[in-house]
Amino acid sequence: MAKNIAKALLDIEAVSLSPNDLFTWSSGIKSPIYCDNRITLGYPEVRNAIRDGLIQLIKEHFSNVEIISGTATAGIPHAAYISEKLELPMNYVRSKSKSHGKQNQIEGAKSENKNVVVVEDLISTGGSSITAVEALEEAGANVLGVVAIFTYGLAKADKTFNKAHIPFYTLSDYNELIEVAKDEGKISLNDIQTLVDWRDNLS
């Protein structure tokens, strides 16, 4: 499954590799990879494969889930597809509380005393995922873990999740993506080393 998802992300250009002309992330980090999984929303076949893959991860690792929770905003549609298929309640978590109305950070199903799985689109450092986890826990939820489409495989993410005692699982990862890109002739051996070095140095 990891290989198929990586191939799909490359084919629809949800993930772009540019070892010699680096992208600039919003954080200012210079990177040879850019991932925008929102592009998957425009491809029903890919979108459904992601939904079914994430459901498989949830059933394997978090079978006692009661609520599916999406991270705002990119995790929300995937959480909606999953909750619809599993016939489970859903909510979503903002990065911070609203400044008006009831000032809710969590919208949708009530999480108190419920087993919740968080759905992310992408894991880089893990910070946004854990922000959502902490908001849910403050609301009384029992967060079982996080599932996501893709991870860069940064050591910092592992540390972030381990510190919070939250397991996470992804459909595909950076190593698988590099392997698929190599097999399809999208990158050279020198490019591979550049990509690996970037990830290792950033970790």
Swiss-Prot record:
What does the record give as EC number?
2.4.2.10
- Write the signal peptide boundaries: none
Provide the family line: Belongs to the purine/pyrimidine phosphoribosyltransferase family. PyrE subfamily.
Q: Which InterPro entries match?
A: OPRT, Or_phspho_trans_dom, PRibTrfase_dom, PRTase-like
Q: Which species is the source of this protein?
A: Staphylococcus epidermidis (strain ATCC 12228 / FDA PCI 1200)
Protein role: Catalyzes the transfer of a ribosyl phosphate group from 5-phosphoribose 1-diphosphate to orotate, leading to the formation of orotidine monophosphate (OMP).
Q: Which residues bind 5-phospho-alpha-D-ribose 1-diphosphate?
A: 94, 98, 100, 120-128
Catalytic activity reads: orotidine 5'-phosphate + diphosphate = orotate + 5-phospho-alpha-D-ribose 1-diphosphate
Sorted alphabetically, the Gene Ontology BP terms of this entry are: 'de novo' UMP biosynthetic process; pyrimidine nucleobase biosynthetic process
Q: How does it assemble?
A: Homodimer.
Q: Matching PROSITE patterns, A to Z?
A: PUR_PYR_PR_TRANSFER
Full protein name: Orotate phosphoribosyltransferase
